[in-house]
């Protein structure tokens, strides 16, 4: 199934936002979720993704210069996890993920117009 994941981009490489954040996330390779308990975060094993590239509670560019990018992914073995609309609604917790490509912001904006 197709899903969308928000990642950090640094020196042209992709990394998770918060959990296991130093892990370089390769493209076009199936990866299995592992559990990395992290202080300040609930333990939810799985790659956190969205049905659409929408996470209104997260900024795309941080004051420290960190930049984020949406990626189109393929996922397997997934469940949904309900969150408030202020956090984008239902999240996906996938046990397997393959990052297909990154999206340009214009592409994201066009996709979101379909769901507005």
What is each model feature region?
Residues 1-44, 60-68, 75, 79:
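ADP-ribose/NAD+-binding catalytic cleft of ART/PARP-like enzymes
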Residues 11, 54, 78-80, 99, ...:
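Generic "edge-of-domain/loop-turn" microfeature
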Residues 16, 50, 92-93:
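Intrinsically disordered, low-complexity, compositionally biased regions/tails
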Residues 41-49, 53-57:
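Catalytic toxin/effector domains delivered as secreted proteins or via bacterial secretion systems
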Residues 56-59, 109:
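Generic detector of well-ordered alpha-helical segments enriched in charged/polar residues
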Residues 62-100:
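Charge-dense polyanion-binding interfaces
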Residues 92-116:
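Active-site or metal-binding loop neighborhoods of secreted/extracellular toxin and effector enzymes
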């Amino acid at each position: 199934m197709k899903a969308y994941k928000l990642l950090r981009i640094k020196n042209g490489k992709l990394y998770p936002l918060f959990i296991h954040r130093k892990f370089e996330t390769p493209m076009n390779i199936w990866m299995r979720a592992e559990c990395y308990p992290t202080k300040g975060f609930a333990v939810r094993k799985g790659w956190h993704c969205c049905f659409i590239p929408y996470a209104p509670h997260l900024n795309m560019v941080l004051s420290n210069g960190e930049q984020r990018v949406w990626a189109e992914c393929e996922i397997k073995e997934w469940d949904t996890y309900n969150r408030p609309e202020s956090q984008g609604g239902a999240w996906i917790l996938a046990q397997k993920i393959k990052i297909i490509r990154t999206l340009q912001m214009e592409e994201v904006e066009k996709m979101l117009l379909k769901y507005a």
